[in-house]
Amino acid sequence: TGQVVLAGEVKSNTYLDVQQIARDVVNAIGYTKGAYQFSGDSCGVISLIHEQSQDINQGVDRATKEEQGAGDQGMMFGYASKETENYMPLALDISHKILEELAAMRREGTEISYLRPDAKAQVTIEYSDDNVPQRIDTIVVSTQHDPFLEEDAAMLATIKKDIIEKLIPRVVRLFPPHVQALF
């Protein structure tokens, strides 16, 4: 659609050029080419930001940060895990690292030059009966890319080869030996 929609409630005495900030973020993510049909330089930016309700603001504004309220809150759930130093479940941590490295490779533009912004990854780990990771069963990576070969099967084969031979080794090096052994 070529649109960015900003929505929410804000209480501030500062002017922010939210349209330009949104465009800068879209460009920083990597949407910079007309071929993507979405670019920070040409997208529409719709701002639905309005002043925070007085009722919520009364619960938030305090003289010190120790007294600061949380305002309007969303609900979420999750859990911490001792599988990783950052307390994220191991499969999610590996997925995040895959996407971080894929984005770094896209920005570098040298090893895999056809990558576009927007990707997702999923990792499935096989566990023993006592919940000890045994091996990585499956890694799925889906990424937007430039069309670089005429035949789809050849393009898919190249992408798969690059993910396995170029991306995954970079990811493996980020982990301690006991996690590297799972790959």
Where are these regions (language model features)?
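Active-site-surrounding "flap" and adjacent substrate/cofactor-binding loops of secreted or lumenal enzymes
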Residues: 12-26
